[in-house]
Amino acid sequence: RGPVFLPRLDDDVREAVVATLTDRGVEIVTNAPVSAIENDGRRVVSGAGSFDTDAVLVAVGRKPETAALDLPAAGIATDERGFIVVDDHLRTSAEGVWAVGDVNGGPQFTYVSLDDYRIVKDQLVGDSKRSRADRKAIPTTTFITPPLAQVGLSEREATEQGVSYLVASKPVANIAAMPRPKTLGETHGLIKVLVDPATDEVLGATIFSVDAQEVINLVA
C-alpha cells in the first residue's frame, strides 16, 4: 500500500530481495491499496489500476480456534479475541495449566513457540525462573524464495538508536564456506552481520539465503 516495498529492511537487503523476485518474474506494484476484488476473484482493483489474476491471497491475520473448547468450564480465561490469557510464565488462570504457541496471543513465530516450550519446561523440571521477560532478540523469517531471516538490530535501527557497530555484508554466491546454495543452484541472496566494535558481540544479522530459517538460529 505504501511507496516502498518491505520498508523496514535496510536498503541493500531490500534491493537484493527485489532483484531476486524480479528475476523470477514477480512484478512488484507499490502505492496500490486494494479497493475491490471482482470477477469471482479473478480481478483486483487497486489505486494503481486493475490486475487480472489466477488467484488472490487475502492475508488478514489469524484467529485462535478456542471457541469450541469450552475453556471457561475449565476455569481458563480468554481475551476478547479468543486468545488464552497467560502470565509471563505462560500460566493460565487455571492451576497447573499452561498455554504455549500461537494460542496465547504472543508473536506468531515458530521461534517464539520454541521459547514457550523452554519456559514451560523450566516450570515443570527447572528452577521456574525463565519467563517471556527474558526474551531479547527474536528471529523472524519471511518465507519467500530463498527465505529472508533476521534477528537483532538492522543497520538502519542501529543508526537510529545511535549504536556503534561494524558491518559486514556479502552476496551468498561469493561465500565459499556455504556450499549448499551452490549445490542447490540457489545462489541468490546475501548475509549481513552487525557487530559491536568494543565487545565483538553480534548486534544483528540478516540472512537471505537457502535454509535461512534454520541458519538464523546459529546467530540467535
Where are these regions (language model features)?
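Flexible, glycine-rich terminal cap/loop adjacent to redox cofactors
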Residues: 143-220
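Short, surface-exposed charged micro-motifs
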Residues: 36, 75, 89, 192-194
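FAD-site-proximal beta/loop scaffold in flavoenzymes
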Residues: 28, 43, 50-127, 217-218
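Short, hinge-like loop/turn segments at secondary-structure boundaries
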Residues: 13-17, 47, 183-186
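Short, acidic, Ser/Thr-enriched surface-loop or helix-capping motifs
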Residues: 23, 79, 86-88, 155, ...
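Short acidic/polar mixed-charge low-complexity motifs
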Residues: 47-50, 199-201
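Rossmann-like dinucleotide-binding cores of NAD(P)H-dependent redox enzymes
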Residues: 1-40, 108-114, 120-157
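Short, hydrophobic/aromatic-rich segments at coil-to-beta transitions
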Residues: 39-44, 164
